[in-house]
Regions:
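Short, low-complexity disordered leader/linker segments with a strong preference
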Residues: 1-34
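Compositionally biased, intrinsically disordered low-complexity regions enriched in proline and serine
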Residues: 8-11, 51, 60, 209
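A short, ordered amphipathic alpha-helix with a cationic face
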Residues: 24, 139, 221-223
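Short, glycine-/small- and polar/acidic-enriched structural segments
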Residues: 30-170, 176-179, 183-190, 215-218
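Pocket-lining segment of extracytoplasmic ligand-binding domains
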Residues: 94-95, 172-176, 180-236
Length: 236
């Protein structure tokens, strides 16, 4: 065999041997366990961490193939979980505790939110600066278990929620407040509060500013409750 051909033959054998060694040393792909995570609401910044973990491969690193199921008005995540239609669910603690009282065998395995994100937002000229000022006013809430902090604040202020003010179920936006159809509206720090600040003030043509608003934060009032947690069935 000519020297030149011998060189290329030896190089080919070396490359093939190296490839076989690399293949032999490479671990077999990890078998992933499929699981489903039910969100409490539609996709929004509230759930950014779960999607970031999918995008960055964190779940796969732990041997999990996670399917994230979007929530909706008619979806109760803890009930979806209890019925076996999801392996895990994200739900506010008070709502899940109500479901437990009703027989749902679910447990909190990860308390994600350490502070409440719920606000009650009013216009500055409404002169609402504390829960006591809701007396005689129309106050919005979404209901569906989202009203527990509000009701606790009303009672802590010495008001009767059935007699001293009007509690109105608001849509999942800030239209009632923007149209001044309520004196105060429920909002989350990571969603609806920003919606107001992204709306245009028709009197100025500029976006509303924080100084145009009064915000009652339930963490300050003392009636805040734990919110987003990851729940699993007791037999998990």
């Amino acid at each position: 065999m000519k020297r030149k051909n011998l060189f290329w033959y030896q190089l080919s054998v070396l490359c093939l041997t190296s490839a076989l060694l690399v293949t032999a040393c490479t671990p077999a792909p990890k078998e992933l366990t499929p699981i489903a995570l039910q969100l409490q609401w539609v996709v929004q910044s509230q759930f950014a961490g779960y999607f970031a973990a999918v995008d960055q491969g964190f779940y796969n690193d732990e041997g999990l193939e996670v399917t994230i199921k979007e929530g909706a008005v008619d979806i109760v995540p803890q009930q979806v979980l209890a019925s076996g239609q999801a392996d895990f669910a994200v739900s506010w603690v008070p709502k899940a505790l109500v479901s437990r009282e009703e027989g749902a065998a679910i447990v909190n395995i990860a308390q994600v939110f350490q502070r409440s994100g719920t606000l009650e937002v009013s216009w500055k000229d409404s002169n609402i600066t504390r829960p006591e000022d809701w007396k005689g006013k129309t106050v919005g809430t979404w209901g569906w278990g989202n009203e527990f902090e509000l009701l606790a604040a009303i009672r802590k202020a010495g008001l009767d929620p059935d007699a001293d003010l009007t509690i109105l179920q608001q849509p999942f936006d800030m239209s009632l407040l923007l149209n001044r159809e309520v004196d105060a509206a429920q909002a989350m720090t990571y969603n609806e509060y920003a919606q107001v600040l992204e709306a245009e003030n028709p009197d100025t043509g500029q976006l509303y500013q924080p100084e145009d608003l009064t915000v009652i934060n339930f963490n300050d009032v003392g009636t805040a409750m734990l919110q987003d947690a990851v729940w699993a069935r007791e037999d998990w």
